[in-house]
């Protein structure tokens, strides 16, 4: 049996390993468009904050180690661009050289993951505006900080990754503000638990602007202006969505 898996991060890598345990003879190939497999998003902010200093510690497996352990072909920098169910093939693009080829399969598993949503707002796409979801995103933010030494940052969103990033940017000495439309951080939490998080963040000098909608961004000579609905705008050297 020949199995193709689209996506090689958490879900795809787990599925591949599980199939190998069930069938030691299956031919398993995983196509991953990024350069990394099997990494944990929650560790990314700690590389930005210099808690993790070795980038290799961000990944649990490499294509080489995965093959050695499971005999699974991990093809990084390969993007599945179309699926042909009638003939059981996929079209794959090698992102390193542009080559496009077809690969046949008996079983196909889709685990492409997700991309961070960039709101359709004025100013999205300016150089000082970042997203944080992948290892590549992490390196871009780290490189920007090392090169430009920003003193302030605005984080749009107060979920798990947002709070970890706020912690690490604050530890780097930056002035950090979290802005979001919900009136509490960590929306799934009960209000009394969220209140404890609010107090802890403020105790460490992190500003919270809650209950306000971001309407756009303006690039300024000294940073980025974040436009808010029904509230004065905020300004910082960089913004992370």
Question: Language model features by range: what are they?
Answer:
Residues 1-77, 166-189:
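Beta1-alpha1 glycine-rich phosphate/pyrophosphate-binding loop at the start
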Residues 7-10, 133-134, 157-159:
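Glycine-rich Rossmann-fold phosphate-binding loop(s) that bind the pyrophosphate
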Residues 1-4, 64-153, 225-241:
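FAD-binding core/adjacent interface of flavoenzyme oxidoreductases
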Residues 25-27, 69, 75-96, 103, ...:
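A Rossmann-like FAD-binding core segment of flavoenzymes
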Residues 140-189, 223:
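Rossmann-like NAD(P)H-binding beta-loop-alpha module
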Residues 15-16, 40, 85, 119-121, ...:
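Short glycine-/acidic-enriched loop or helix-start segments at secondary-structure transitions
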Residues 18-21, 43-46, 89-90, 122-126, ...:
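Short, glycine/charged-enriched secondary-structure capping and boundary segments
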């Amino acid at each position: 049996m020949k199995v193709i898996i689209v996506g090689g991060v958490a879900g795809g890598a787990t599925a591949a390993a599980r199939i190998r345990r069930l069938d030691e003879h299956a031919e398993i190939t995983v196509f991953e468009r990024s350069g990394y497999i099997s990494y944990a998003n929650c560790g990314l902010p700690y590389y930005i904050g210099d808690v993790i200093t070795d980038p290799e510690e961000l990944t649990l497996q490499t294509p080489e180690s995965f093959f050695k352990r499971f005999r699974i072909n991990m093809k990084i920098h390969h993007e599945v661009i179309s699926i042909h169910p009638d003939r059981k093939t996929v079209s794959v693009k090698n992102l390193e050289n542009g080559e496009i080829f077809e690969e046949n399969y008996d079983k196909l598993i889709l685990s492409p993951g997700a991309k961070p949503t960039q709101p359709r707002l004025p100013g999205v796409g300016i150089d000082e505006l970042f997203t944080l979801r992948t290892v590549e995103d992490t390196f871009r933010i780290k490189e920007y900080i090392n090169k430009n030494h920003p003193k302030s940052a605005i984080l749009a969103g107060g979920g798990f990754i947002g709070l970890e990033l706020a912690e690490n940017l604050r530890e780097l000495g930056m002035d950090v503000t979290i802005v979001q439309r919900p009136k509490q951080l960590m929306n799934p939490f009960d209000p009394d638990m969220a209140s404890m998080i609010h107090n802890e963040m403020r105790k460490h000098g992190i500003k919270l602007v809650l209950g306000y909608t971001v309407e756009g961004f303006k690039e300024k000579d000294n940073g980025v202006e974040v436009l808010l609905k029904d509230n004065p705008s905020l300004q910082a050297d960089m913004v992370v969505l």
